[in-house]
């Protein structure tokens, strides 16, 4: 019995020594391992028995404690966890992934929702606007010119895509008309009221179909085109004659094509009435939009080039003739000052004249303007009586009373001898002389 007790004591002492060493090692592992980071975040102690069961024996913590009751005395406190190499590994992986992504194109984050898209577009426009404001005048023109040329190339590509796939290989062999027939059909076409309008789409399947439907009952037809130039109208006339097989009689007023269907006209099948060579309605509209945009861009590019040349020329003149420019500006400023002073003086004179005119407009002047009816009646009553008597004399003289008898002759002879000039009688003198002449006639 004594031997057994001694052996047990030796074994327990050896086991306690081993457990102390293991506890120190386990304490270091627990402080450095990420397994117990959650435990380290909580301010509490960790018993060594739980660690021994979990790490050494790899058993569950729900094991009955009677098997390891002798380990309860040895315990340690947890310490803050140290940073391990896992974070460094994750960082290195992220950096390597970023390097790999930099080689390839960075994918833009997908925007979720309409508001996010609108917000991104607003920011993009604001950024472009600020960049444009920071540019110089020459850089602005160059930027506009670059954009215009890119737009021209893009429109040319879209125009090529909108061209019909099948090539137009149909040939036109029109009938020969005599001058009399041509005159007759042209007169008929000018009088007829049936017409086909051609809008901004130009020639497409619907226009040709409409023409054939008109030719079903009428020989002549008017094609009215108001959205193209006269040269383009002539090209459209040639194209319509080729596609429909009709005869172009005349282009009236530069916008109306008069066409004749032909002598032996028969309504063709639907494949010819709406040929695939031409564009459908939607594509014709897209082509017209591209054509208008291309025309506008081609007008805009030379204007920008001209502005750029003027700007460069102004910059060169500023470098060469800096003093001359300053003198010119000074002279212009002086001229402007003189013009402003003259205008101010003219305004002052006009104001003075207006004030003087207002002072002259007295009550008596206004009374002359606003005369009453009673005053006019008084003036009529105050008319002299001899004027009424003279009005009774005949007005027609038949050029006989120009001499006014002997008195007039004597008077005129005396004046001729004195001054050798023709007499100038007043109306009253003429009336008196005429009255005297008539009285003499009555006495005779």
UniProtKB/Swiss-Prot annotation:
Disordered: annotated span: 77-107, 344-364, 392-426
Polar residues composition-biased segments: 92-101
Entry keywords, A to Z: Chloroplast, Coiled coil, Plastid, RNA-binding, Transit peptide
Record flagged with keyword Nucleus: no
SUPFAM superfamilies: YhbY-like (SSF75471)
InterPro entries: At3g25440-like (IPR040286), RNA-binding_CRM (IPR001890), YhbY-like_sf (IPR035920)
Amino acid composition bias (Acidic residues), ranges on this chain: 346-357
Transit sequence range: 1-72
Protein location: Plastid, Chloroplast
Chain coiled-coil ranges: 292-355
Cellular component GO terms held in the UniProt record: chloroplast
Biased amino acid composition, Basic and acidic residues: 406-426
Primary location: plastid
Molecular function terms from GO: RNA binding
The CRM domain, residue ranges: 175-272
Name of the protein: Uncharacterized CRM domain-containing protein At3g25440, chloroplastic
Organism of origin: Arabidopsis thaliana (Mouse-ear cress)
């Amino acid at each position: 019995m004594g031997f057994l007790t001694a052996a047990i004591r030796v074994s327990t002492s050896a086991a306690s020594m081993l457990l102390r060493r293991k506890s120190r090692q386990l304490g270091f592992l627990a402080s450095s391992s990420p397994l117990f980071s959650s435990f380290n975040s909580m301010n509490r102690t960790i018993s060594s028995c739980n660690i021994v069961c979990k790490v050494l024996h790899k058993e569950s913590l729900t094991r009955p404690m009677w098997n390891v009751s002798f380990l309860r005395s040895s315990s340690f406190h947890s310490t803050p966890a140290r940073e391990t190499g896992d974070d460094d590994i994750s960082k290195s992986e992220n950096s390597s992934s970023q390097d790999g992504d930099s080689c390839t194109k960075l994918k833009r984050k997908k925007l979720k929702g309409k508001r996010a898209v609108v917000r991104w577009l607003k920011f993009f426009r604001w950024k472009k606007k600020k960049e444009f404001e920071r540019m110089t005048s020459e850089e602005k023109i160059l930027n506009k010119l670059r954009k215009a040329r890119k737009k021209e190339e893009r429109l040319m590509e879209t125009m090529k895509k909108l061209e019909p796939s099948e090539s137009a290989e149909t040939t036109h062999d029109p009938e020969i008309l005599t001058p009399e027939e041509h005159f007759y059909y042209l007169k008929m076409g000018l009088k007829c009221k049936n017409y086909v309008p051609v809008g901004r789409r130009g020639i497409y399947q619907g226009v040709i179909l409409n023409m054939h439907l008109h030719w079903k009952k009428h020989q002549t037809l008017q094609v009215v085109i108001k959205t193209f130039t006269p040269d383009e109208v002539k090209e459209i006339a040639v194209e319509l004659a080729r596609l429909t097989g009709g005869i172009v009689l005349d282009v009236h007023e530069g916008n109306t094509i008069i066409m004749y269907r032909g002598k032996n006209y028969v309504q063709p099948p639907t494949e010819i009435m709406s040929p695939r060579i031409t564009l459908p309605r939607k594509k014709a509209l897209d082509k017209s939009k591209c054509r208008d945009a291309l025309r506008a861009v081609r007008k805009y590019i030379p204007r920008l080039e001209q502005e750029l040349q003027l700007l460069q020329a102004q910059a060169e003149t500023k470098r060469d003739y800096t003093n001359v420019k300053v003198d010119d500006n000074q002279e212009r400023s002086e001229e402007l000052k003189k013009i402003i002073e003259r205008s101010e003086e003219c305004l002052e004179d006009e104001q003075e004249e207006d004030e003087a005119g207002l002072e002259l407009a007295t009550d008596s002047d206004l009374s002359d303007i606003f005369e009453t009816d009673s005053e006019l009646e008084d003036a009529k009553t105050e008319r002299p009586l001899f004027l009424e008597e003279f009005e009774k004399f005949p007005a027609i003289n038949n050029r006989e009373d120009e001499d006014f008898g002997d008195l007039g002759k004597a008077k005129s002879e005396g004046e001729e001898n004195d001054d050798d000039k023709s007499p100038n009688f007043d109306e009253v003198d003429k009336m008196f002389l005429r009255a005297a002449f008539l009285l003499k006639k009555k006495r005779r």
